[in-house]
Amino acid sequence: MDYFYVDIETELGEMLTYYVAAMNEAHAEELATIAFENGEIECMGIQIVSIYAYRA
């Protein structure tokens, strides 16, 4: 497991950064998407427009 930052942009133009432990970039994006959908990431937007993971 490595640590990743995941940048998320919502339909309202909000830019959020989420920190997660994952196996690779795709896994980090998947975990961040799940956290977003479960309401663990607080924001006004309800839809992800773009998502990008990179190693911390």
Model-derived segments and spans:
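Short aromatic-glycine-(Arg/Gly/Cys) micro-motifs in beta-strand/loop hairpins
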Residues: 1-15
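Short, mixed-charge low-complexity intrinsically disordered segments
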Residues: 34-56
